[in-house]
Each structure stands twice: as C-alpha cells, then as structure tokens.
Design a protein with these regions (language model features):
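Short, surface-exposed ligand-recognition loops at beta-strand->loop->(often short) alpha-helix junctions
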Residues: 9-20
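Short alpha-helical
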Residues: 13, 47, 72
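Generic beta-strand hydrophobic packing signal
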Residues: 6, 87-90
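An amphipathic, aromatic/His-enriched active-site/gating alpha helix that lines ligand/cofactor pockets
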Residues: 24, 28-38, 54-88
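Residue-level signal for secondary-structure boundary sites
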Residues: 14-16, 60-61, 95
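Short, well-ordered beta-strand segments in beta-rich or mixed alpha/beta enzyme
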Residues: 2-9, 37-68, 101
Length: 102
C-alpha cells in the first residue's frame, strides 16, 4: 500500500474553484468506485491550504488518472497554486476506518 499526502496552498481567488474540482473528483470516484482507493481532501483553517490523502495499492496503478475530472483538476491546479505543492509518501502506522476497511 502507498499513501501520499499532498499539501497545496491555493491562490485566494481560486479556492472556490479548487473546492468545486475536489467535489467533481469525489463524484467521479463515487461513480467509478475503483477498488482499494481511499481519497480525502481537507481545507486547513487558513482557508487556502488543502491537504489531500490518497491511498493506492502498490501495483503501480493510479486509478484517479483514468478519471477526466481528476485530469482536469490536476491541469487547473498548475494555475491555482500560490506556491509549489509539497508531496510526501507516508507509512501508515495506525488507522481506524480512514485508510483500511474495518
């Protein structure tokens, strides 16, 4: 299993656009229902920083890349970033329902 955390500061004028794009991705995931994928996006209290968590299996696949809504969001984010995003791979040391099924 691979878990990625993306922390991205968005320009003030694009926060609503970024939130709408996240909602489109969630809707696309609801429709596609890819197996073994967990995705969450949160807005920090500063109102401009998003933190996304993505859990994928280690087989090298990335089902989100197959979703047009995700591709559109990634392309738009290039213009919406206030600064380069920080992407880190994480090791899960414990999870209750967020990254594993119970």
């Amino acid at each position: 299993m691979k878990v990625l955390m993306v922390r991205a500061k968005i320009k003030d004028e694009n926060v609503a656009d970024a939130q709408a794009a996240v909602e489109k991705v969630i809707q696309a995931l609801d429709q596609a229902q890819p197996a073994d994928v967990r995705y969450a996006s949160c807005l920090l209290s500063d109102g401009v920083t998003f933190v996304a968590l993505l859990k994928l299996e280690d087989d090298g696949g990335h089902p989100l890349r197959e979703l047009p809504a995700y591709a559109e969001m990634v392309e738009n984010l290039k213009q919406w970033y206030a600064e380069p995003p920080d992407v880190e791979q994480m090791t899960v040391t414990g999870s209750y329902g967020l990254l594993h099924d119970r």
